[in-house]
């Protein structure tokens, strides 16, 4: 019971502070499952094309050589 009251108190503080700062509260409910997948895809594309990012994933050359030897 105390944990529920504490959680409600934290939510209340979040709402009060957001109202004081004139900000909207984002609870993650504005985007559905397909929107989340599309957002992750877009972030991955942006990271792959970013010059300072990790780049795109490439397979190790040893795997490709083994595949070519057996064919």
Curated annotation (Swiss-Prot):
UniProt keyword Signal, yes or no: yes
Keyword annotations: Secreted, Signal, Toxin
Predominant place of localization: secreted
Cited InterPro entries: DH2-like
Region (Disordered) location: 45-71
Sample GO molecular function, one term: diuretic hormone activity
Biased composition regions of type Basic and acidic residues, renumbered to the chain: 60-71
GO biological process: body fluid secretion
Expression sites (tissue/organ): Expressed by the venom gland.
Signal sequence coordinates: 1-21
Family named by the database record: Belongs to the scoloptoxin-21 family.
Name recorded for this polypeptide: U-scoloptoxin(21)-Sm1a
């Amino acid at each position: 019971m105390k944990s529920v009251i504490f959680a409600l108190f934290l939510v209340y503080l979040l709402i009060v502070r957001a109202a004081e700062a004139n900000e909207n509260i984002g609870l993650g409910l504005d985007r559905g499952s397909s929107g989340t997948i599309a957002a992750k895809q877009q972030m991955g594309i942006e990271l792959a094309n970013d010059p300072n990012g990790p780049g795109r994933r490439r397979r190790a050359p040893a795997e490709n050589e083994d595949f070519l030897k057996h064919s």
